[in-house]
Amino acid sequence: MVRLRIVILVYFVASLVLGAQKLDNLKCMFLGYPELEYDGFDRTEVLTEKNFNKTVFSEDSKSVVFFNDVEEDDPELDQYECFMQLSAQIMTKRGYTFFTVNTTKEVKLRKQEGVDKGEDTIHVYKDGFKIEYNGVRDPETFVSWMMDIPDDPVTIINDEHDLEEFEDLEDDTVRVIGYFEPGSAALKEYEEAAEDFMGEIEFFAVVTSKWARKVGLKRIGEIQMLRPFEEDPIYAPSSADTEEEIEDWVEKHREPVMQKLTLENYFNVWKDPEDDERMILAFVDEETREGRAMKKLLDKIADENSEHAGTLEIVLIDPDEFPLMVDVWEEMFGIDIEEGPQIGLVDISEKEGIWFDISQINLDDPKKHSDSNFEVLQTWIDQIMSGSITLEDDDDDDEPEPTTPPTPVKGKKGKKEL
């Protein structure tokens, strides 16, 4: 087993004293960090439609806004407060201001900021940019993510350190990189397009031929997108040179075939797919021999199925990175994750799945059986994409066959069914 990442567990008691400068009745304990204590001070302010824009979009402001519909009598209130207040305790020292918006009361503001009804969302507003946090509600993960927020929407590659940063993200996130003349209008358009994707897609640029060659760009104005686990880049059309055109191109191609579930992207990935998408979960422990063989096979599957991007979504999950969730997932889908790799077509909200028979592939000698393993798994993928394998079949099997209602007796009025 790999060294498990320390997880902060938040325990809470008592109730919140609203409007107090110090929340004396809010007790938070963080296991794993004995010296870490919440000092009891309320560092959050309430925002409304009247003061929102002038507050979060003011010059040089760094605002963290918690959009929520948690009510005073909600049992989750104290847990939510502990997460929010400890994060504020740490990050206010670094220039951030923390706010809350009650989405039940501020409906117009909720819609303005693109927050769905009943959804708890966290937005960071920094230097005029809005960045949405999609990670788990854990102070350690959230604070770490905030500290890594870049100062600029585009990283200019000027040295080996920048190049290493670009290369290290290979299988972690979607990357976009372009070659521009320094200070050009085209670079400005590219930077403005990148603003709308901060926190979701990493944008890079090169402004010299030396670094352009190192990242595989040949001509000024060339833009590439590199998606996780796919070898070949996607090229933007040469006509895409304005902010709007670049945004449209990125939006069209941004969905990778396979992406890894992490603490930072959890709620952006662990959600029901769109109606025309198929979601496949792949539980793979990369510390085991079978897990490494399965991961290598899935890498090839993702690369060979790039034409299905946007309609096929493979979510790669390393159980070692989510030890507290293994039992939950096993019970949810009726599988044994610790037994070995598991891969299945799933419906998250319905908590059901159709699971591939792993015995059909040979993971003990993957080199010898590389071609046959790929063929078998690809055939299964093809059946899913063609509709031969579908979760809807299971739903249909459970439904009783419709019966023909009896013909009403002539001369009598049938009763209306309510």
Map each language-model feature to its residues:
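N-terminal leader/targeting and pre-domain segments
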Residues: 2-69, 86-174, 180-183, 197-209, ...
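Residue-level detector of functional hotspots within protein domains
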Residues: 30, 38, 189, 300, ...
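Short pre-active-site segment immediately N-terminal to redox-active cysteine/selenocysteine motifs
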Residues: 60, 68-73, 284-287
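Typically the conserved alpha-helix immediately C-terminal to a functionally engaged Cys/Sec
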Residues: 71-93, 99, 105-106, 183-199, ...
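A short acidic, amphipathic alpha-helical/loop segment
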Residues: 109-112, 189-193, 214, 297, ...
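Eukaryotic modular interaction domains in large regulatory/scaffold proteins
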Residues: 272-327, 333-339, 344, 350
